[in-house]
UniProtKB/Swiss-Prot annotation:
MF GO annotations: ATP binding; pantetheine-phosphate adenylyltransferase activity
E.C. no: 2.7.7.3
Identification of the protein by name: Phosphopantetheine adenylyltransferase
Record-level GO cellular component terms: cytoplasm
Amino acid sequence: MKKIAIYPGSFDPITNGHVDLIKRASKLFDEIIIGISQNSKKKAFLSINDRIDTINTALKDINNIRILSFDTLLVDFASLKNAQVILRGLRAISDFEYEYQLSGINKHLNPNIETLFMTPTEQYANISSSLIKEIIALGGDISVFVPASVKTLLKHRL
């Protein structure tokens, strides 16, 4: 059976931390599905198409990924795509409590899907899409935190 993992997130924008986790996870699974969540409660910074384009460009050297968007329960999306694992990144201990609760709920909703927590490479431990947006809003340089595809897109937009 093909080992498939879903790595969900808003990826608004994708960061070097996301890229690092995906590259490392791609060595553990036959396929990684990058699931871009469409959360109607959050105001998106980038469109879904822009996120797909920047992710595609940032990960062009990884052959075992697919990028899809979804607007359903994560476990339903994972089941639909025949994924056995949900990947979650833990940047800090403060992330753990929420992620642990979420994994328990997901396990209750679908006992066949496991959650795998991955910690970041140290240099990416403090990066988040929210912080990137704040740096952009204040006119700061984000080039060390995001792939070139994100920097290029934002340079032409802002």
